[in-house]
A protein has these predicted regions:
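A short acidic/glycine-rich loop-to-helix N-cap element
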Residues: 267-279
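Short, gly/Ser/Thr-rich active-site loops of penicillin-recognizing serine hydrolases
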Residues: 186-194, 280-292
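Intrinsic structural disorder
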Residues: 219, 257, 271, 283-292
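Beta-lactam-recognizing serine transpeptidase/beta-lactamase-like catalytic domain environment
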Residues: 1-22, 28-267
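Hydrophobic alpha-helical membrane-association signature
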Residues: 157, 278-281
Length: 292
């Protein structure tokens, strides 16, 4: 039976499969930092070519030299654009467990998310719960802050993070059904947009949008769409024994200045960075949606 097949071919992975989010989680850490009022996109934060996890001999490094910064520091915007592991690991530790986990919870982590349609669509279902670890030591907090360790998400959760940034910090209730029509095509019911929480301020959302646009303009130009401003964050989560494989991610929305679509894409068990594994899929989805 397909339902018992090891690859789980009929599993709804958007709502029922957890993946490490990799660097897409840096958007959550950035939101937590911006909300304190002590950070701006141009704020210089500690970075460097390597960072030793507190209390260990394990070192984090970066994928590209631009992520190291200069003289041990990098701007928040460049840290996100070049996906600086050393910067965001240190930023997460500096903010502390409570600040990062609180922002994650405001964005839907650690709570089941009900996917609803309307009164006429049958029984709603509940997604599996995305998780950010709490009450952890700084070494684990550093890893969790770059979307590794015990941080796990559903694709739905990551799409909701992107949508919250696009919606001025408002986390929206996900729904599959826009409206229900009768046999004569008259509208029986229509789903109304519902705000689940105000995760962060519109000012923070605007600054995050600016930073996510820089992800495209400064580092991932392959994700650019002609005539459209695109805001994204890529992710390359290491998985498997010895971290030998990758879950490639990209989350984002467009147009950045007037959002119409928010997307999360994950490609499991590949050997490509998220920008190249998931990026073309996101780009095609955005182009198709914006062409309608």
């Amino acid at each position: 039976m397909l339902s018992k097949s090891p690859p789980n071919p009929i599993l709804n992975r958007a709502t029922s499969q957890l993946y490490p989010p990799g660097s897409t989680f840096k958007t959550v850490v950035a939101a937590a930092a911006l909300e304190t009022g002590q950070y701006q996109p141009d704020t210089q934060i500690p970075a460097g070519a390597s960072y030793t996890l507190p209390g260990t001999v394990t070192q984090l490094t970066n994928a590209v030299p631009q992520a190291d910064g200069a003289d041990g520091k990098i701007s928040m915007e460049d840290a996100l654009a070049y996906s600086s592991n050393t910067a965001f690991a240190q930023l997460g530790v500096s903010l502390g467990d409570n600040a990062v986990s609180s922002m994650a919870k405001k964005l839907g982590f650690d709570s089941p998310i009900t996917v609803d349609g309307s009164d006429y669509t049958g029984t709603p279902w509940v997604s599996v719960t995305s998780k950010f670890p709490t009450d952890i030591n700084d070494d684990k907090l550093a890893l969790a802050s770059i979307g590794q360790g015990d941080t796990v998400v559903t694709p739905l959760q990551n799409a909701m993070v992107a949508a919250a940034i696009a919606n001025d910090g408002k986390l929206m209730q996900p729904t599959l059904v826009d409206r229900v029509r009768s046999a004569d095509l008259s509208v029986i019911s229509q789903t109304k947009p519902t705000v689940m929480s105000h995760a962060f301020s519109a000012d923070t959302a605007n600054k995050l949008t600016q930073m996510m646009e820089a992800v495209v303009t400064k580092e991932n130009t392959n994700l650019a769409i002609n005539g459209v401003q695109v805001a994204v964050k890529t992710g390359t989560a290491q998985i498997g024994n010895g971290n030998t494989s990758i879950d490639g991610w990209v989350i984002g929305f467009a147009p950045a200045d007037d959002p119409k679509i928010a997307v999360a894409v994950v490609v499991h068990n590949v050997d490509l960075y998220g920008s190249f594994a998931a990026g073309p899929i996101m780009k095609a989805m955005m182009q198709e949606a914006l062409a309608e």
